[in-house]
Design a protein with these regions (language model features):
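C-terminal catalytic "cap/lid" subdomain
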Residues: 1-172
């Protein structure tokens, strides 16, 4: 609602609750749930809310595995300007981000991962094929934020032998 700590933000507000059951019902029908950044007070007043906050709150409420943000920027960048392909929540919080919209997206991505969403992605809507590249290639096209490092290599141990044999067995033929 538009009043926080005694300050009236007029027609701007925050998400107070999400109809998770309604959203899941739409998704269960294999339909797309299109959500606007508008909220309604109990009195019927209309408030503008942050689209990234709506996405964050809905993703958490429905138990989403993944949350994808589209922005002009292709993702988060290191101090040297290099695109960060993946990072943990802690390392994302530590980034010094100047752009206000990038801060909002980073904050929503980190909060959603902290509250149960496995992965959040920040991609550019200006790059053709960015979504497909992010989802179906090793390096992706933007920034992946996750609670823990998403991809880690480790040395095989004795417990891995059965799985390794299963993987290479078709190659023996």
């Amino acid at each position: 609602i538009g009043i926080h700590d005694g300050v009236d933000f007029l027609h701007s507000g925050t998400v107070r609750r999400v109809d998770a059951e309604g959203v899941r019902g739409i998704l269960d029908q294999d339909a797309i749930a299109l959500l606007s950044p508008l909220g309604y007070s109990p009195a019927g007043e209309i408030f503008s809310v942050s689209a990234s906050e709506v996405a964050e709150k809905v993703a958490v409420a429905i138990g989403a595995d993944k949350l994808i943000f589209l922005d002009r920027q292709p993702g988060l960048h290191a101090a040297d300007g290099e695109l960060i392909r993946q990072c943990t929540i802690d390392s994302a919080w530590a980034l010094d981000i100047v752009d206000a919209e990038q801060q909002r997206l980073r904050d929503s991505a980190c909060r959603s991962c902290t509250n149960g969403v496995a992965r959040s992605h920040l991609l550019s809507y200006e790059r053709e094929g960015a979504l497909l590249e992010e989802l179906f290639t090793h390096d992706g096209s933007g920034t992946l934020i996750a609670q823990n490092p998403y991809e880690q290599a480790r040395s095989a141990n004795i417990n891995d032998i059965a799985s390794i044999v299963e993987v290479i067995r078709p190659l023996e033929d």
